[in-house]
Amino acid sequence: MPEYLINGIPVNFPFEPYQVQRDYMARVIECLQNSSNGVLESPTGTGKTLSLLCSSLAWILHKKAQVQASQRTNVSELKEFEFEKKKMGGGGGGPKPEMDKLLDELNENSGKEGGRWGVPKIIYASRTHSQLTQAMQEMKNTSYGFMRAVILGSRDQLCIHPEVAKEEGNAVKTNLCKAKIQARACSFYSRVEACKERPEITGSTIMDIEDLVRVSTKLKACPFFMSKELIENADVLFMPYNYLLDPKARKANNLELANTIIILDEAHNVDKMCEESASMQIRSSDIALCIDDVTSIMKVMDNTVAIPEDDDAKKDFTIDDLALLKEMLLSLEKTVDEIPVMFSQGGSTQPGTYIFEIFEKANIKEGNYHIIAQLLENIIQYIATITEKNNFVRRGGGLQILAESLSIMFAGSGPQYRESIDKCYKCHIDIEEQKKVRGNTKQADGWTATKQLVPSVKANAKVINFWCFNPGFGMRQLLGRNARSIILTSGTLAPLKPLISELDIPIAVKLENPHIIDGSQVCVKIVGQGPDKESLNSSYGNRDNPKYISSLGRTILSFCPIIPGGLLVFFPSYPLLNKCQEAWQETGIWAQISRTKPIFVEPRGKDQFLNTMTEYYAKINDPDGKGAVFMAVCRGKVSEGLDFADMNGRACIITGLPFPPLKDARVILKKRYLQEVRTRENEIISGDEWYSLEAARAVNQAIGRVIRHKNDYGAILLCDNRFHNPRQKAQLSSWIQKHLNTAQHPTFGPIVRELSQFFRNAEKTLPQAKLTRSLAPLGPEPPIALVPDSTSLLVSGETKKKLDDIKNNFIKIENSNAVTAFKLSDYQHAHRSDATAASGKDFLSRLNTQVRTIDFNDMSSAGPSSQAGLVAIHKRERSNESTMVTQQKKRKVVLIPQETISLDDSLEVLEVKPERQAPEDRVELLKVIKSSIVPAQYKRFLVVLTGYRNDRDFGTMMGGMVEIFNRPELYYLLKGEI
C-alpha cells in the first residue's frame, strides 16, 4: 500500500489522498503530536473515517517504534538506577529525592508507565454499534489490519447464556448475569480465563460484535467478558458514546482514560450525549415501586419457608438494613408529595442543588451515599437470583432507577462540585401523568413484573427532573482523567465556534473541510412554493393548513418522475409525517406518488425498521423498477448514519425546519440557561441562536445521507421558504452554502426545469452505478417513445423546447418500461396465441379489432410467472366507429423460444407499438381526457389550464400536468392539451 509522509509521520493510504484528506490527516497527527484537542469537520463522502484511522494508527506505530528504541538504549541504565535506589533505600533522605526524580524521567522516556510502555490507546466512540461496525470494517481494509482492536458491547449484544439472553432489557440481563456469576452458575463465564489465550482469540486482531459472538460461541466462552480480557493488549477500543461519557459505565468497564486518545466520531450529537449522561429523572411511581420491592423482600426474609435459603441466594444485607432503607424511601415519598407544583405554570423549576435538599430530608446524603448504593446493588442482585429460582414476581425496576439516579447526583463531592451543580443544572418538578398499565404486560425496559405491580399514580405524584445544560460538564470529566487528546469529528459540526464554546474544553486544532465534489454533482434548490403557488412553510402555526399540506404533497409528486432511483423525504417530526400521510391518502396524492415510485415510511420499531430498509434497497436494485420514496424524520434512524449512496438516494427533500418543541420545559430552560451564562468574553451563543442551530444541525445531518463518495451525485431540495433567510442559510454546512450561491428561482416551474436538466447532464457525464440484473438487456435498442414528438405540436418554438425537455426526462425515468429492459427468454415458455393473422389493412382499420397487448407498465408481471409461465396480457375492447372499416381478423402474435433464433432475427419479430394519437378536435380531446382520469384529477386539470391562461407560466402548468398525466399510457394526451 502506498506510503505518504504527513507531518513527519509515514502514513499508509490505499490510494493517492485528495487534498482534503491530506489536510484532515495532518490535523489529526498535529493533535496527537502536541497532546492537544481538535474539532474537525469533513463532509460525508470525503473519506473521513479512512483518513482518521490511517493517520491515528500510523502515529501509534511511530510512537511504538520510538518507545522500543528508547527502551533498548535506556533499559540497562534503568536497572542500574533501580539497583542504586535499593542500596540507598534506608540511608536517610539526602540523595533519595534526586534519585526518584531521575528514575521518573527514565520511566517516562522509556515509556514504562501506562502498562504498555507508555504507548497510548485509541478509544474510538460513535453513536451506534452499526456505525462502529462500519469503522471496524474500514480498519480491516487498511494496511493496519494487523493492529489489535476490540469492541465493547452490552449483554444485549454479547450474552450467549440461553436463560439470560431470553430476558428483555439490558438491566434485567445485567443483574441476572451477576447473580449467576456470583452463584458460579454460568459455564460460559468460567471458560473465559482458559480460552483467552487460544489461537482463535489471539489470532483475530480485529474483533467486532459478530466476530466475538462467533468465536466465543465456538469456544463456549462468554463474549461479553472475553471482550474485557482483550482490552489490555488492544491498540484501539471501539465503544458507544455512553460507555465513555457515563461515569457508571466507565467504572463497570474498568476504562482507564489516562494517556488515551479519545476520538468522538459523529460528534454532532456529542453535546446532547454529554448532557443526557449527566441528567436523571425519577418519578413518584418509581419511589412507590422501590417501597413495594423492599416490602416484598422483607416478607420473603420473614417467611423462610416460602423461599428457602441456599448458597445461590446469599444475602449481603439484613432485615434491619431493609427496614432502614424503607424508612428512607417513605420519607422521600412524603417529601416529594409535599413539593408545591402549579401544573398550569408548566411545573416548578429550582436551582440544581435543590435535588440534594429533597434527598437529604430522607437522610440520603453525600456521607452515606456509598453505603446506600452498595445496599441497593445487593438487593437488586438478590432479587435477580430468587426471581430465577423461585418465580419471584418482582424485578427491582424502581430500585434500579433509584441506584442510577443516585450515581448521577453524587458523581462528585465537595463545595466545588456543588457550585458546578448550581451553575450547570436545574431541578424541574412536574406532575406525573397517569400511565395505563394492564395486567400481564411489561414495560419496554423489562423491569415491570408480569403481574399488575405498578401502583396507581396519586393525584399529588411528581416527576423530579435533574437536568444538565452544560455539555462541558461531561467533557471536563474526560480531561480530568488525563486523556492525551480529544478529537471531535463529523460531517456536520458547523458552525464550529458555538460548539467549541459550549464544550468548554481547550481546542487548539480546528478544520472545516470543503467537499470533494464539484458543481456538476450537486443541485441545491430552495423551493419556497408548490406548483399551485401555495407558500411552503412548515412552521407550527401553518402545519394544520390543508392548503400547505396539499401543496407539499403535490411538490413531492412533481419531483418524483424527474428524480431517478431513490428519493429521501425528511419531515421535522413524526406527528407531521403522520398528518401528511393521512391527508394525502384521503385526497389521492399518496396513490399518485405510489404509482410513480413505491413509498416506504420510517417505522419506530427496530425489527420493522430493518425489514423496511431491506425492502427499500431491494426495490431500488430492482432493474425493472423506477426507484422508491423513503419518508423519514429528521433526527430519526434514517437521518443518522445510514448510507444512501448512488441510486439509493439521488435526491433529498427537506420538508421543513426541525426545531425542538418550543413549549417543552427542557427547551425553555436550556434557552434560559444560555441567556444567563452568556457573556461577551465566553462567546456562548444565545438561547435563540441555539434553538435555530438545533434545527440546522438536524437538517445538515439529513442532507448528508446523499452524495456519499467522489463519483456520487444528487439533488438537495429545501422545501420551506424560511431557508431563504440569510441567518438560516449561514447555519448550513459550508459546502452546501457554496452551492446555494447560484440564483434561486421564486417560482416552481424553473426549479423543475433546472432539476430535470441537472439529472440529464449527470446521467450523460458522470459515472453511473450499475444495478445487479438477473438478465442482460437485449442491446442498444432505442426505448419506446412515451411522449409524442414535440415537432408535431402546433405551439411556439420555446414551448416545443420545454416540452422536449419534459419528454426526454419522461423517457429516462420510464426507461424500465422500454423494450431493452426485457428478454426473449421471458417469453420462451409462453403459449402461442391462437389468434389468426391480420390482413394487410392500414393501421387505423386495425383499431376496430379486438387486440391483446402486453402491459409493460405492470411491474407485478415482471419476470417469469411462478405459476403458469405465461406472459401477462390484458384484453381491450374497441368500439365501432363510422369512420372505420368493418372488423378485421385478429392479429397473430408470434412468440419464439430464444435459443432458436439469432439476435438480429429477434429484433425483427418484436414490433414497437405505434404511438396513440390524441383527437385534434378540442371537444373530443376533453371527452377522452375526462374518461381517462378520475374526476378529481379532471377538476385539477381544468384548474391548471385556467391558471395557464391567466399567468402564461409554462413551468407551473407543466408541473401540474405532470401530476395529472403521470402514467405512460396518458402521455400522448399532452399533445392535445398544449
From Swiss-Prot:
The keyword Transmembrane helix does not apply. InterPro entries: ATP-dep_Helicase_C, DinG/Rad3-like, Helic_SF1/SF2_ATP-bd_DinG/Rad3, Helicase-like_DEXD_c2, Helicase_ATP-bd, P-loop_NTPase, RAD3-like_helicase_DEAD, Rad3/Chl1-like. This is Regulator of telomere elongation helicase 1 homolog. It is found in: Nucleus. It comes from Culex quinquefasciatus. SMART domains: DEXDc (SM00487), DEXDc2 (SM00488), HELICc2 (SM00491). It is an enzyme of class 5 (isomerase). GO terms for molecular function: 4 iron, 4 sulfur cluster binding; ATP binding; ATP hydrolysis activity; DNA binding; DNA helicase activity; DNA polymerase binding; metal ion binding.
